[in-house]
Amino acid sequence: MSLPRCTLLWARLPAGRGAGPRAAPCSALRALVGSFPGASGRVPCLAASSSASGGSKAPNTSLFVPLTVKPQGPSADGDVGAELTRPLDKNEVKKILDKFYKRQEIQKLSADYGLDARLFHQAFISFRNYIMQSHSLDVDIHIVLNDICFSAAHVDDLFPFFLRHAKQIFPVLECKDDLRKISDLRIPPNWYPEARARQRKIIFHSGPTNSGKTYHAIQRYLSATSGVYCGPLKLLAHEIFEKSNAAGVPCDLVTGEERLTVEPEGKQATHVSCTVEMCNVATPYEVAVIDEIQMIRDPARGWAWTRALLGLCAEEVHLCGESAAINLVSELLYTTGEEVEVQKYERLTPISVLDHALESLDNLQPGDCIVCFSKNDIYSVSRQIEIRGLESAVIYGSLPPGTKLAQARKFNDPNDPCKILVATDAIGMGLNLSIRRIIFYSLIKPSINEKGEKELEPITTSQALQIAGRAGRFSSHFKEGQVTTMHRDDLALLKDILNRPVDPIQAAGLHPTAEQIEMFAYHLPETTLSNLIDIFVDFAQVDGQYFVCNMDDFKFSAELIQHIPLSLRVRYVFCTAPINKKQPFVCSSLLQFARQYSRNEPLTFAWLRRYIKWPLLPPKNIKDLMDLEAVHDVFDLYLWLSYRFIDMFPDSSLVRSLQKELDAIIQEGVHNITKLIKISESRKLLNLESLPSGDQSRLSGASKSPARRTRGTKSAGNKATEPLSPSDKELPLASRLVQQGLLTADMLRQLQKEWLTQQPEHSREKVGTRRKKKDPDSD
């Protein structure tokens, strides 16, 4: 090697290398980590410094996803380390690395720097692959490995390089303290300086359902010079919006999917009715009303009530809800220096639990409401009621708001023959219903536990009281409410549940903001959004009065669109869009919307019509009805995004008009729901699932897209006269008659019985013989 070349290479080495091959790595190790365990003057480790500064729990390292560090390829300057020393023997290097891995001292030192057994193993595997697969190594590590080969250095001298590599694949190790500060959620009141700048008057209106607590708060809201109403549902926000304007108080409406202004030229009204997530904590009001404050404990949405409670900038804040929330609210507002005035209310009409169960649908009376906790029970009960010659209205959670209101009006109308309501717990709030008797079809409700697992548990006292309280409301035709169960065995349990005291609410929900997630991403730029959320929740520090809300739905959306190239802020907004992850079509629509956005292609009205295969026909069966509900949710998703990205979702008004048309189609389907149930039962009777896929799609409307199942332009009334395609003509006569709506399952059974009874005895024996021979083949 020439002298100039040697001088150049030597100059590139880090300062301190001139002390010799043995001294250099040792000094590097001391400079980075200090003396080894047992020696004085050891550098404090990350874990120790974190503990000292915050006293926080150790992080869940299973959430740390290692990044990939690619081995170094050939260098333009050649292998400088080999030129200064010699080429490394890969077999010798592998032995050195294996010895390094097995050293107990190294494992202990790694643990001090936050590398538990799992992280240490993953970091070592990556470190070894990097060393073994690189064409040329950095000069310093090459020299250390060479020195170890010649016993001129100790294997422990590799630790600084190993730690540097570990921090490359686990960047969270480098910034633990910063991440803990960002995710410190222990003083939420400080997030709202505008609210803290004034002394608010807090009035808690406490009472059971139908006690008038919300009425008194709304009266104060209407008399104020400015006000905001924060409700849990779009239906409630709409109701206050209409009441306020009807009372001559100009009021705007703000929900996730809708904005309505009443003043000319779009000027903001003095009052606004909104869903609680949409309240503006920067706008000053004279009066604010927060409805259903007990939902501050909700595992998914509780953060919105916490934000409204601590952040609304109003002279008076009126809270309406259960008494179970009084203590927690008082404790939270004690930290802000605000006192809570409690006004308690009693129920306006009496309600009683009957001593007998319904036991049979034959015992139904006008004004009865059967509460089910599954759609299958809704369909089954509705069908049984129809068989008895009675009409029923149907309300469940996934129905569009307009359809729910239409069914409520039908049930409440004294001139309508529909006197029975079949509903889920969706009737617990948001609808004014004239119910005389609540009948619990079951007391078991599916729920999702903290691990995301489905559980079947009896309803809570709070849930039972909320639902039972819908009977005999003050404004209804029935001045006394009654509650019972469908089955005799459930009645004692219902009485026990209703007589239990409601457990006081222990904690309020919190939720990371977009700004906090952005700061996390600044420190962990290569980490996925879903993983960022996991790490944030794990690092988050809250006191006993708060909890971090369940973010599984957010993470589901984040993972769904992870491969789409979007900025972090845009990705965050898409992930906060409210979707039902049980609806595949809605999930695929979110993905498609994000993909279009990433291409900078506006999602126009024409594009959306093509996407959903508009126009859509009335549903032919229950599955079609569910598909139409999914399309309605897709419209909601479009409208929700249109208020966040107006340039990319420009046709909100046209989509809203289309959604109203779809709402009418769904209303027609729900009105005829018992007919849809009949057809669905007929499909099961005929075992249509065993037909060829083409015939099945012809009968059931099945296709790749939910919207396509009801695609077409002919009206439902012309279906019986539609010409049959060649494939239809090959179907059995019974299948074709069911397809055209001319026969139902009950009709087929009756025809079969009549045909058998009219045959001579010897003919029936032959038929029976043929069936017996056929059965083994069918198995």
Curated annotation (Swiss-Prot):
Biased composition (Polar residues): 693-703
GO BP term, example: mitochondrial mRNA catabolic process
Modified residues (N6-acetyllysine): 99
Cofactor(s) in the UniProt record: Mg(2+); Mn(2+)
Location(s), subcellular: Nucleus; Mitochondrion matrix; Mitochondrion matrix, Mitochondrion nucleoid
Phenotype of the disrupted gene, per the record: Die in utero before midgestation. Show elevated sister chromatid exchange (SCE).
Transit peptide, UniProt annotation: 1-40
Domain of life: Eukaryota
Any one GO molecular-function label of the UniProt entry: protein homodimerization activity
Sorted UniProt keywords: Acetylation, ATP-binding, Helicase, Hydrolase, Mitochondrion, Mitochondrion nucleoid, Nucleotide-binding, Nucleus, Phosphoprotein, Transit peptide
Region (Disordered): 693-732, 754-779
Catalytic reactions of this protein: ATP + H2O = ADP + phosphate + H(+)
Residue numbers of Phosphoserine PTMs: 725
Enzyme class label: hydrolase
Compositionally biased intervals (Basic and acidic residues): 761-779
Activity regulation remarks: Helicase activity toward DNA substrate is inhibited by micromolar concentrations of 5,6-dichloro-1-(beta-D-ribofuranosyl)benzotriazole (DRBT) and 4,5,6,7-tetrabromobenzotriazole (TBBT). Helicase activity toward RNA substrate is inhibited by elevated concentrations of TBBT. Inhibited by some ring-expanded nucleoside analogs.
Domain Helicase C-terminal: 353-521
GO cellular component terms attached to this protein's record: mitochondrial degradosome; mitochondrial matrix; mitochondrial nucleoid; mitochondrion; nucleus
Gene3D superfamilies to which the protein is assigned, alphabetical: 1.10.1740.140, 1.20.272.40, 1.20.58.1080, P-loop containing nucleotide triphosphate hydrolases (3.40.50.300)
EC number: 3.6.4.13
Annotated ATP binding sites: 207-214
Region (Interaction with LAMTOR5, important for protein stability): 650-779
Domain Helicase ATP-binding, residue spans: 194-334
Family under the similarity heading: Belongs to the helicase family.
Quaternary structure note: Homodimer; in free form. Component of the mitochondrial degradosome (mtEXO) complex which is a heteropentamer containing 2 copies of SUPV3L1 and 3 copies of PNPT1. As part of mitochondrial degradosome complex, interacts with GRSF1 in a RNA-dependent manner; the interaction enhances the activity of the complex. Interacts with LAMTOR5/HBXIP, WRN and BLM.
Protein name as it appears in the record: ATP-dependent RNA helicase SUPV3L1, mitochondrial
